[in-house]
């Protein structure tokens, strides 16, 4: 079944209709050589096993064989999760440990996603764009090429409450740390958002905005460009 992930109602339907998952990993000290484990993924022999699968299936194996188990340890990081994490193996970008990126996200070539960043379903990250530490890109947020989204900054999602217009950030935009781009706002190419700003209205191309709510304070000039220069070496 296909879904139009540019429509918040379609994303909601996708989440509703997705099979919810509570995967677990269990380390077992015990004899499971005769256990029935066809419905899960497992590894091991000679008294030590690792079981990976849905919690109810793994729990049944543990309970059915509890008389043969000396010890076990269970690891679990989600409950009734509707959307898996993005498969990073095919992404031509640098993704650092601790980034949380849901499935159905598009990440461009040579982009960088730093530790603690969160990127929600339907988001699009352009080539060479950096999403810095602890930044958040909500559902359907769109960042162009060579954007820098500063540490702790937020590009609001448009899933709940539903909105047809996502946040859109043009090419070569720099968004300072801890700024917030509110729902549906568009940032024009080459503009700069000062750190800590709250942007509630569209921003034209080539300007600097600051404050809460953010206002235009100047046009981007050579001095601004010098202070907001991106480093290509970080994207290789």
UniProtKB/Swiss-Prot annotation:
CDD domains: LbH_THP_succinylT (cd03350)
EC number: 2.3.1.89
Key words, A-Z: Acyltransferase, Amino-acid biosynthesis, Diaminopimelate biosynthesis, Lysine biosynthesis, Repeat, Transferase
Catalytic activity: (S)-2,3,4,5-tetrahydrodipicolinate + acetyl-CoA + H2O = L-2-acetamido-6-oxoheptanedioate + CoA
Entries under Gene3D superfamilies matching the protein: Hexapeptide repeat proteins, Malonyl-CoA ACP transacylase, ACP-binding
Pathway noted in the entry: Amino-acid biosynthesis; L-lysine biosynthesis via DAP pathway; LL-2,6-diaminopimelate from (S)-tetrahydrodipicolinate (acetylase route): step 1/3
Keyword DNA damage: no
Record GO biological process: diaminopimelate biosynthetic process; lysine biosynthetic process via diaminopimelate
Domain of life, source organism: Bacteria
InterPro entries: DapH (IPR019873), DapH_N (IPR013710), Hexapep (IPR001451), Hexapep_transf_CS (IPR018357), Trans_hexapeptide_repeat (IPR050179), Trimer_LpxA-like_sf (IPR011004)
Gene Ontology MF annotations: tetrahydrodipicolinate N-acetyltransferase activity
Coiled coil: none
Keyword tRNA-binding: no
Annotated PANTHER family: 2,3,4,5-TETRAHYDROPYRIDINE-2,6-DICARBOXYLATE N-ACETYLTRANSFERASE, ACETYLTRANSFERASE
Family assignment from sequence similarity: Belongs to the transferase hexapeptide repeat family. DapH subfamily.
Physiological role: Catalyzes the transfer of an acetyl group from acetyl-CoA to tetrahydrodipicolinate.
Full protein name: 2,3,4,5-tetrahydropyridine-2,6-dicarboxylate N-acetyltransferase
Organism: Clostridium botulinum (strain Alaska E43 / Type E3)
Gene: dapH
């Amino acid at each position: 079944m296909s879904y139009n992930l540019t429509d918040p109602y379609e994303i909601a339907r996708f989440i509703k209709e997705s099979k919810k998952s509570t995967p677990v990993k269990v380390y077992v000290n015990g004899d499971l050589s005769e256990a029935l484990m066809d419905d899960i993924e497992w590894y091991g022999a000679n008294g030590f096993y690792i079981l990976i699968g849905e919690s109810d299936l793994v729990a049944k194996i543990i309970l059915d064989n509890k008389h043969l188990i000396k010890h076990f340890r269970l690891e679990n990081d989600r409950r009734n999760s509707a959307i898996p994490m993005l498969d990073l193996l095919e992404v031509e970008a640098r993704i650092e440990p601790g980034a949380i990126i849901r499935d159905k996200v598009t990440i461009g070539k040579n982009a960088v996603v730093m530790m603690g960043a969160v990127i929600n379903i339907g988001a699009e990250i352009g080539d060479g764009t950096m999403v810095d530490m602890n930044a958040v890109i909500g559902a359907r947020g769109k960042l162009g090429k060579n954007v820098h989204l500063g540490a702790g900054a937020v590009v609001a999602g448009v899933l709940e409450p539903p909105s047809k217009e996502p946040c859109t950030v043009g090419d070569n935009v720099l968004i300072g740390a801890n700024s917030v781009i509110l729902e549906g706002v568009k940032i024009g190419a080459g503009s700069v958002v000062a750190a800590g700003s709250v942007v509630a209205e569209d921003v034209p191309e080539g300007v600097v905005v600051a404050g809460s709510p953010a206002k235009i304070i100047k046009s981007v000039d050579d001095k601004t460009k010098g202070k907001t220069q991106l480093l290509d070496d970080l994207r290789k």
